[in-house]
Each structure stands twice: as C-alpha cells, then as structure tokens.
C-alpha cells in the first residue's frame, strides 16, 4: 500500500492527503473530492451560513481561492431539475444525472431535488465548481460521482433522513 501511495504521489496526481474527510459538515471520501479541486495544499471548508435544519451553504477553497460552492435546502417545494436547468443560464449542457431520479449534471454544476423525510417537501442540493466551463466540462463524471455520494449523507446531516 505504501509503495502505491508513493508511486501515485510521484506522479503528482494524489491530492487526497490534503483534503479533509468532511466537507461542509458532511463526511465524504477525499478521493471523490480531489479531481474537483485545483492543485494546492491548504484545503478549507468555510461555512457561508450556519448549518441549520433547513439551509446550509459553504465554500470549499484551496489556497484561499474558492473552488466549490455547496448549498443545501430542505423543506422546499419540488420542481423538475432538468426543466429548471434548461431555463437557467448558469447550466451549460444540462442532462439528467445517473442514479438520482430528479437530478441534473452540467458543465461545472449539479443540482438534485429529492424527497426530504416522509413529508411532501423536498431537499435541494446545488453544487457549483468555480472554474471555467471549458475545464469543468471535462470533469462532469467526477462531479456527478462526488455529488451522488454527498447527497445521501448531506440529507441525513440536514435532517431529511433519520
């Protein structure tokens, strides 16, 4: 195992050692986060609002520069994520995400609208990558893997799942 880690580090592709195992109060595998972040050692999550039962917003930064914006809402009215993405100018090349019924992946952006608890309200997870869309479009699969892994844990932390 140590030989593999040294080999990967020597290639310059292993950023996971600098990435916390929690982002925005949510446990996440660092290997899923690493491809979404620029090179750098000083990875921090900075809450932009206190985590509450209905709203959480934070920024993941590397070297003091914002890299990811993660926003969660619970208790929201449901809406069609793909229709929303097609109407919003922030979504470039939106398409349905795999593995989540009402979710969209776009160049540098992910949004999912899923049931929150047993009520009729919804949880919304909105993730934005802070990079040019020309770079972000090459990371769609990685963003989707990260987001679909973050989603169920984030829903528990915000109170949608027990």
Residue ranges, per PLM feature:
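C-terminal motif of bacterial Sec signal peptides marking the signal peptidase cleavage site
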Residues: 6-10
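A small/polar (G/S/T-enriched), proline-flanked helix-loop surface module common
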Residues: 13-162
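Sec-dependent N-terminal signal peptides
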Residues: 1-2
